[in-house]
Amino acid sequence: MTRSVWKGPFVDGYLLKKADAALSSGRKDVIKTWSRRSTIMPQFVGLTFGVHNGHKHVPVLVSEDMVGMKFGEFAPTRNFPGHAADKKAKRK
C-alpha cells in the first residue's frame, strides 16, 4: 500500500536543513544520514549523501532519475557472497 497523496512525501527535517545549508554554501561534502526512509526530493539533485547500510555509509550521488525514491533503495544492507562451489567438480 502506497502513501496517501494528501500527506505528501516524507523527509526527515534535519535532512532538509543539511541539504539547504550545503546548497547555499556551495560545498560538495558528503551528507551523512541514517534516514533510509526519507524520500529523495528535487532539491537534493547533485548532492552526495552517505546512506547508512548498518555497517558503513554508502555514498549516493543523487540524480534526477532518483527523485521520489527512498534513500534506502540505493544502499543494500545484505551482501550476497554467491553460492558455494561444488568441491567434487574442483578436484577433477
UniProtKB/Swiss-Prot annotation:
The UniProt keyword set, sorted, is: Ribonucleoprotein, Ribosomal protein, RNA-binding, rRNA-binding
Give a Gene Ontology cellular component term annotated to this protein.
Answer: cytoplasm
Keyword match Lipoprotein:
no
Q: Which GO terms describe its molecular function?
A: rRNA binding; structural constituent of ribosome
- Xref: InterPro entries: Ribosomal_uS19, Ribosomal_uS19_bac-type, Ribosomal_uS19_CS, Ribosomal_uS19_SF
Superkingdom classification of source:
Bacteria
The answer to whether keyword Zinc-finger applies is no
Q: PROSITE patterns from the entry?
A: RIBOSOMAL_S19 (PS00323)
Q: Which biological process terms from the Gene Ontology are attached to this UniProt entry?
A: ribosomal small subunit assembly; translation
Which family is annotated?
A: Belongs to the universal ribosomal protein uS19 family.
* Function statement: Protein S19 forms a complex with S13 that binds strongly to the 16S ribosomal RNA.
| Name of the protein in question | Small ribosomal subunit protein uS19
Its source organism is Caulobacter vibrioides (strain NA1000 / CB15N)
Taxonomic lineage of the native organism = Bacteria, Pseudomonadati, Pseudomonadota, Alphaproteobacteria, Caulobacterales
The gene it comes from is rpsS
